[in-house]
Amino acid sequence: MRTELLCDESKYTDILACIFEASTNNVDQICTPSGLIPRIGEEFIRDHCDFSAIIDFPYGISETKIRVHEILLCQSRGIKSIDLVINRYDTENGNLHSIRKDFKICYEVCKTKGLRIRPIIEYRLADNEFLPQLCYSLRENGADEIILGTGSVVDDLLDNIICSRLIEENLDINVISCFPVLSQEHYDMFNDSKIHGIRIKSYKILDNLCNIR
């Protein structure tokens, strides 16, 4: 199972600790809000760790032109992977047209610059009918992987696992689940469910996981 680590620490010492813990554990990628990218040495980004930049974290409510500007800034610092937070109000209101328009523009910018882009959906805000429509639309407009949750909304472990599996099975697209995994038991439940991957919310949790695989 793919394992990613969310790094949204405010202190520079914690950012360094996050990078160190990710490097010494079996973490596939460090995912950090775009605003923190300038605080991370480019040598880490370009030469040592696999980073993704989370654009418009955690609400996704900025105008498209601002989101594009952030993408370009991150690309200039060596970032190769972009995680785009889908507008939470559009998600809650089922505004598929607005989401599709924004994502297509950001996708084309990333494609031109040789970047991978993945949408982040705050799935707890979407109703049961809209969520599969949204995921299908994002897949058809270039997404090859979907991240469920920013980690900023209260979630339920079983709901998350069930939702992730339904999306993967019905829409044939990989899902990364961002859930507050707190123990090896939580981790094993996700791993046993055969979900493509998880995103751990804090580097401090890594000490509780003795078997990342």
Regions found by a protein language model. Give the residues of each.
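Hydrophobic faces of well-ordered beta-strands that scaffold small-molecule active sites
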Residues: 1-8, 28-32, 49-57, 82-84, ...
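Conserved N-terminal beta1-alpha1 strand-loop-helix module at the mouth
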Residues: 1-76, 137
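Glycine-rich, proline-tolerant flexible connector loops at the mouths of alpha/beta enzymes
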Residues: 23-39, 81-101, 147-158
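Alpha-helix-loop-beta-strand connector modules within alpha/beta enzyme cores
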Residues: 34, 38-57, 96-118, 156-183
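Conserved, mostly hydrophobic/aromatic
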Residues: 40, 74, 119, 146, ...
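Glycine-rich phosphate-binding active-site loops on the catalytic face of alpha/beta enzymes
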Residues: 55-58, 77-91, 140-157, 179-182, ...
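Catalytic cores of alpha/beta
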Residues: 62-76, 126-137, 165-177, 181-197
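Conserved anion-binding
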Residues: 81-147
